[in-house]
Amino acid sequence: NMATCATQHLANFLDRSRNNLGTIFSPTKVGS
């Protein structure tokens, strides 16, 4: 249960990081 919650938070964090940082550094990696 704890691992699932942590995984969802991590996935959400990575998703926002891709949207924000990914667009700045390399937009091509956003699709990966």
Curated annotation (Swiss-Prot):
It comes from the Eukaryota. It holds the Pfam family Calc_CGRP_IAPP. It is found in: Secreted. The mature protein is largely unstructured in the absence of a cognate ligand. GO terms for molecular function: hormone activity; receptor ligand activity. Belongs to the calcitonin family. GO terms for biological process: amylin receptor signaling pathway. Can form homodimers. Interacts with IDE and INS. Interaction with INS inhibits homodimerization and fibril formation. InterPro entries: Calcitonin/adrenomedullin (IPR021116), IAPP (IPR000443). The keyword Flavoprotein does not apply. GO terms for cellular component: extracellular region. Its main location: secreted. Keywords: Amyloid, Hormone, Secreted. It comes from Sus scrofa (Pig). This is Islet amyloid polypeptide. Amylin/IAPP is a glucoregulatory peptide hormone that plays an important role in the regulation of energy homeostasis. Selectively inhibits insulin-stimulated glucose utilization and glycogen deposition in muscle, while not affecting adipocyte glucose metabolism. IAPP function is mediated by the CALCR-RAMPs (AMYRs) receptor complexes. Amylin can also bind CALCR receptor in the absence of RAMPs, although it is more selective for AMYRs.
